[in-house]
Amino acid sequence: MSISQPERVLIIKLRHHGDVLLSTPVVDALKHKFPDCEVDMLVYAATTDVILDNRQISNIFTIDREWKKQGVRVQLAHEKALFKSLKARNYDWAFNISDQWRAAFLAKLCAHYSAGIACCKRDNFLWRHCHDFLNEELDTSHHMVESNLNVLQPLVLPEEYPAKVRMEISPANRESVLEKLSAQGWNGEPYVLAHPGARWFFKCWEDGKNAALLQLLLLNGKNVVLTASPDAAEQEMVQSILGRLKIPDGVHVWVLSGCLNLRELAAAIDGA
């Protein structure tokens, strides 16, 4: 074990899909400076899709939010199994880029050295005790990627690595999207992809405005692929938008609603 030449590192990011994706430059920065280092990640189970094909990551460990609904005994069994798996990896470093106590405790207990962010809301003895190194919490004038990379300062200075968000897409997921499009009559035509839904509906544009934009694209000869998650509200949104469209001759609208995982959605976006 070496503090300056790590062989095994754990990155903890317990947040949403986008937050996990924006943590991938941390993995890249470590692999850039320490190519032989094994980098693992601990994330919520629901967010694994965005990093599942990332070849820079050796192992992905997960916490399922459903554990707490299964009763205290079952939850404790899951937590114990997770702790045992993490401890067995014998990490040189754990980098906590979350603000949860669970992440702080695991970082402290599962690695020789732990680093985190000096969060304002965690300005207390216990948070400091859980981390051997605490880096400054950057203000909102900095991008989240910069804030994430800032946690690496004991090993990697931010200026040493050009930040790059990475979401790899496997050939199998690319092929799956092509098959699903082909099943709807797509024959390789270029398309514009629209994904009007979101986890939080306050972020969504109005159905009428989405439809007006897509109608304009169709009138200008652009084919459209319309995607949505399996969520019932998003399905309803797609139907509402489709019901407002008048599709001219010679152009197409293909709907991939509720049938794509996140990696397939990324492949569809990449093909647009």
Q: PLM features: residue spans?
A:
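Catalytic machinery of carbohydrate-active enzymes
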Residues: M1-A272
